[in-house]
């Protein structure tokens, strides 16, 4: 029994880190955290950028394409959902008269859509005017 207590008492000593070492390790940890937060921020910025004008990098282009596809799919589902205006969906060329024939709610949404389209055609600051896309 006494032998056991003796082994329990014995402690392994650890060498104390010098102040400089402690500081550097702390700095390294902080730097790591900083880069992580920076990366997160960059992602957010990129997302915001894809919402705004498309950037010219391949990755950004892909992102905008995907965003466009997402938007298109939601638009498609929206047209499927509205049972009142199948004619408007069938004939996009005659958009305004079809909207006039449908109830007021549909006309409101159509107006919004047309406004969105016109705003899409407007050039970004210092950019060229975008050609009107069919879809």
UniProtKB/Swiss-Prot annotation:
GO cellular component terms attached to this protein's record: chromosome; nucleus
Keyword Electron transport assigned: no
Keywords: Chromosome, DNA-binding, Nucleus
UniProt KW Signal keyword: no
Subcellular location: Nucleus; Chromosome
Domain of life, per lineage: Eukaryota
Function per UniProt: Histones H1 are necessary for the condensation of nucleosome chains into higher-order structures.
GO molecular function: DNA binding
Biased composition (Low complexity): 1-17, 80-112
Record region (Disordered): 1-135
Amino acid composition bias (Basic residues), ranges on this chain: 18-54, 62-79, 113-135
Name of this chain's protein: Histone H1, macronuclear
């Amino acid at each position: 029994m006494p032998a056991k207590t003796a082994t329990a008492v014995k402690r392994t000593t650890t060498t104390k880190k010098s102040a400089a070492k402690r500081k550097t390790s702390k700095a390294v940890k902080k730097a790591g955290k900083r880069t992580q937060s920076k990366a997160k921020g960059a992602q957010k910025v990129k997302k915001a950028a894809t919402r705004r004008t498309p950037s010219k990098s391949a990755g950004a282009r892909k992102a905008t394409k995907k965003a466009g596809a997402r938007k298109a799919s939601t638009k498609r589902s929206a047209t499927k959902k509205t049972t009142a205006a199948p004619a408007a969906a069938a004939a996009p060329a005659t958009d305004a008269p079809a909207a006039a024939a449908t109830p007021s709610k549909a006309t409101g949404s159509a107006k919004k859509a047309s406004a969105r389209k016109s705003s899409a055609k407007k050039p970004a600051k210092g950019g060229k005017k975008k050609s009107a896309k069919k879809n």
